[in-house]
Amino acid sequence: MKTFLLFLLLITFNANLTHAEDAKFTIEEDTLYYNTEKKDLKSGYVSYSDIYSFRKFLNENPNISKVNLNSSGGSAGAGLEIFRVLSDFNVDTVVSNECSSACINIFLAGNVRWLHLGALLGFHRPDWDAVSMQEYFNNYKEEEKWSDTFEFSNWIQKDTILITSKIFKNYTDAGVNVSLTVDTLKIDNDDMWYPSRQELTSAGVVSLIPIAVNKPQLRPMNLGLSSPELKLSMME
């Protein structure tokens, strides 16, 4: 009986958590909006619970072709897994305000990656603060059989290398220049690097879009210049 009651409590907890995470999402026509900066969210950051929500909303709404992101970051591991989910759905990604830290991994999953005028993409290397590490060690030391903090440190080293390798792979798969990828990992977690639009497009982070896709072709002014075939990906 106690086991059954515990099972019911776990189901209720998971349902409430999922519902709370769903508050980050809204749908308008063909666009799924993901916003971790809303007020009163249970977890106002990119979290592992969001993986299920992304999968659910995209499966239930096959008309969605764009995902609009607004987030200052969160769990690097969650962002990497959401990248994998979005990659399956062949959607475009859009940023109209800011997408930073772990959110970048989600943005790079876009088939086409739009950056609105004035919007920001922020980069820094992933980090794990001391308080969270202490909590993780206390919660999982028996399960993982860590006899002391030295064994835990060895595990952290391996996990850090794994996360870094996944970031490199995602950036490479998305067509991002290796030089920029390396530069992002040089930025301390307490800082944030916001590259210029030119830097982002040159490095393959933001897509180059044919003019006809964005707005009608205008008659070129007589400046002795040829009309460009491509322009920076901007949405007005």
Indicate where each model-derived feature is located:
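N-terminal organellar transit peptides
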Residues: 19-94, 114-116, 127-236
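Sec-dependent N-terminal signal peptides
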Residues: 4-13
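Catalytic-histidine neighborhood of serine endopeptidases
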Residues: 124
